[in-house]
Amino acid sequence: NDLTSRRYGQYTMNQESTTIKVMEKPPFDRSISQDSLDELSMEDYWIELENIKKSSENSQEDQEVVVVKEPDEGELEEEWLKEAGLSNLFGESAGDPQESIVFLSTLTRTQAAAVQKRVETVSQTLRKKNKQYQIPDVRDIFAQQRESKETAPGGTESQSLRTNENKYQGRDDEASNLVGEEKLIPPEETPAPETDINLEVSFAEQALNQKESSKEKIQKSKGDDATLPSFRLPKDKTGTTRIGDLAPQDMKKVCHLALIELTALYDVLGIELKQQKAVKIKTKDSGLFCVPLTALLEQDQRKVPGMRIPLIFQKLISRIEERGLETEGLLRIPGAAIRIKNLCQELEAKFYEGTFNWESVKQHDAASLLKLFIRELPQPLLSVEYLKAFQAVQNLPTKKQQLQALNLLVILLPDANRDTLKALLEFLQRVIDNKEKNKMTVMNVAMVMAPNLFMCHALGLKSSEQREFVMAAGTANTMHLLIKYQKLLWTIPKFIVNQVRKQNTENHKKDKRAMKKLLKKMAYDREKYEKQDKSTNDADVPQGVIRVQAPHLSKVSMAIQLTEELKASDVLARFLSQESGVAQTLKKGEVFLYEIGGNIGERCLDDDTYMKDLYQLNPNAEWVIKSKPL
């Protein structure tokens, strides 16, 4: 198969033989990933696979295998539309398409094309099955959207997109096509140029504009991954939004848009994006290993309310760190298989009782237990739904696009998976920070961890499928990107936040129209309502001044004059400087300034948010200082 033919090597894992067979390099058609790795650097990968094979032979119990359902015709697209929040366009739940018009009207042309493509497939499938469901033609809905855009002032959408993108173009491509040297060189010895990542324009639109403006085929990224471009986020005056900063109702909209955007990006670049679905199976609902993350967290939260990362996972990491991260071969050298099996059984029996003797756990054993925990999750840490999409990242032409896809995939992960992945990546970075002593470079760590993340024990794949599933160098490179760019991956792109703001504004208008109709029916004084509505926001605050509420601080409210340079950190500093008594112990980082209401549900502001710029973007917001919810 195509993927197999482009690999440096493959391994077999038959019952008869446990030897790893590394095939010769194919002379042609090497993928991006293979160009960036030499054969020596693959050794850690194959050794790790052999260690996994041995440890699975000593596994303490047979785990029930997750069945990954092969979807019927049209079923994949139907599921996709549900995940994208558009299930009311078809089927038994089909209702007034007006409900989706607000959502669809905020989409870019590439996002709209992705939705249209899936609706047409579902529509054809349902017609074949002779189902009498009313399926609105999405082209009609988008026609309304186009009409409203044509009448809007300020030029067309694609014009503004291109204008906005021009300032970033060239720099991205230059950095994406860096050619590295033969051997692995630590990044700090070869400083790669810093390149701004454009978060203001849809990623799929950027890819399409690049395709349209370039007559030649986009050159694929090459180069040793040690010289990956150093991408950075340009400062956004309205503040950078990170995962965890938004209220749940807005985060739900972000996830819908992230799925549509990811699909649009893969469509534009001609990469197949297949979501998978796990059939529900009976899993353990207590214990430590082979337990779903959500079940683990439920039992942990009974002990420690608000816990977001499994206690056993945290304890294994802290045990490794207690012995110092300078140990040579950390993560690479396995613990003895029999000892690991015994430790697993002992942990299951004693961990929650608090009687387990952690002093008896050697550092390499703790590292092996950590990797075992990840592998034995009933569903992969990267989720059944998106595991293949994470793998397909290696097929995107440029490093910039690979980073953009990973950003959207991280947003799409369930909360428990995303939080645990973040804790893992932060730990791996700390290991790499000690590479001079432990001899574990970012590439070594990526090689060792890739099979543990991408080869989920519970998926129970046959050896032939498994060879295709693991895709050696490709998954190692995806792992490397996750580690290197982790600080960027937990950012919500500005264009998506702006789409959420637009949706909220349109929904408010719709609600207001409904309210006016209702008031008219009730023979209410409509004028009085409109007058009230108009004056609520300018109540007692003069122009150019915001009123900041701080219900839990001694100074509960303050009017603050907006200036060009006023930042969120300045507002916080003014409040905290006036604290006395108990509240004086409040430190920076314990309370945050929030933007609440207007065109957003709730958003925690980063310190560098320029308040005047944000006020202009959301003049109807309230400004509140409070701590982050657990």
Model-based region annotation:
Residues 1-358, 447, 451-535, 541, ...:
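Intrinsically disordered regulatory linkers and targeting segments
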Residues 258, 292, 312, 332, ...:
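Beta-strand cores of modular interaction/reader domains in eukaryotic scaffold and signaling proteins
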Residues 270-287, 513-630:
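Intrinsically disordered, Pro/Ser/Thr-rich cytosolic linker and juxtamembrane tail regions that serve as
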Residues 299-303, 307, 381, 404-410, ...:
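An all-alpha helical bundle fold corresponding to the catalytic cores
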Residues 386-387, 399-475:
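Alpha-helical bundle/repeat cores within regulatory domains of eukaryotic proteins
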